[in-house]
Amino acid sequence: MSNVPAELKYSKEHEWLRKEADGTYTVGITEHAQELLGDMVFVDLPEVGATVSAGDDCAVAESVKAASDIYAPVSGEIVAVNDVLSDSPELVNSEPYAGGWIFKIKASDESELESLLDATAYEALLEDE
């Protein structure tokens, strides 16, 4: 079973979301998602300043197996991207919940967080796959 940290929120598309002290949210893909994709070779990051809606594809993770869209779990403005991934996309594999984060977003409607899954619900989703 994949590692599913209890303090994070999750989307059904296998993104995770963590609230930061400054009120922004850090987004990445889950350990389960990176295991399915395999070794990352490139991450196409969103533009800082871009406004996205929940469910919009805003980044792409390319692995040796496939390219997979990464979706915004909530609506808002992209306020930072993990530029380190340009040279080290393998961090998505080795540190999916730490150094392998993809982008940070300032949520425009925090009520959208209610539609995300907690760790228990995400684990149940994985068991059904």
UniProtKB/Swiss-Prot annotation:
Keyword Nucleotide-binding: no
Keyword Cytoplasm in record: no
This protein's UniProt keywords: Lipoyl
Cofactor-binding details, from the entry: Binds 1 lipoyl cofactor covalently.
InterPro entries per record: 2-oxoA_DH_lipoyl-BS, Biotin_lipoyl, GCV_H, GCV_H/Fam206, GCV_H_sub, Single_hybrid_motif
PROSITE patterns: BIOTINYL_LIPOYL, LIPOYL
An annotated GO cellular component: glycine cleavage complex
TM spans (from-to): none
N6-lipoyllysine modified-residue sites: 65
Cofactor: (R)-lipoate
Domain called Lipoyl-binding: residue spans: 24-106
Subunit-level organization: The glycine cleavage system is composed of four proteins: P, T, L and H.
Function: The glycine cleavage system catalyzes the degradation of glycine. The H protein shuttles the methylamine group of glycine from the P protein to the T protein.
Name of the molecule in the record: Glycine cleavage system H protein
Organism: Shigella dysenteriae serotype 1 (strain Sd197)
